[in-house]
A protein has these predicted regions:
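ATP-binding N-terminal substructure of ATP-dependent carboxylate-amine bond-forming enzymes
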Residues: 2-3, 11-150
Length: 150
């Protein structure tokens, strides 16, 4: 596996004043949507909230991207969808952000690294990695080149 920039605990990270923003992307349109949510819960619980600002970004079975800020347990049950706010990944490599849409207004939400926790199609085939590479957003996992192997 080729690993992109990964945020790991180090003295350099601890000395930084602001927290790095880590986005966990889960769900998706594949038949493994529920498995992805279960994996995301484990990842969200494992991330150190004192070191990182954690964003939960879920993709519904219909393909809608939502940012969710509620209890992690709702990710596993699927209740997160009721409380999510529409969000998109900006393809603009100079921004490195999500775009949150509220009341017709667009707010940029900067992100330092993405942890894609998508299973099946669009998650394990290199699609999400390719999207992140186009936006030049660092991510954890295999490089998009894996989509060329089959």
């Amino acid at each position: 596996h080729i690993i992109k920039k990964v945020l790991v605990g180090s003295r350099e990270d601890e000395s930084m004043v602001s927290k790095k923003t880590v986005a966990v992307i889960f769900g998706g349109q594949s038949s493994e949507h529920e498995v992805s949510r279960t994996s995301a819960v484990m990842m969200l619980q494992a991330l150190d909230k004192e070191k990182y600002q954690v964003l939960s970004v879920g993709i519904t079975k219909k393909g809608q991207w939502l940012i969710y800020n509620g209890p992690v347990e709702h990710v596993k049950t699927g209740e997160w969808e009721k409380f999510g706010t529409p969000v998109s990944l900006s393809p603009d490599a100079t921004k490195k952000c999500f775009l949150k849409i509220v009341g017709g207004n667009v707010k940029e939400i900067p992100v330092d690294v993405v942890i894609p926790v998508l299973h099946g199609a669009w998650g394990e085939d290199g699609t999400i990695q390719g999207l992140l590479e186009m936006a030049q957003i660092p991510y954890v996992g295999r490089a998009g080149i894996c989509r060329f192997y089959g």
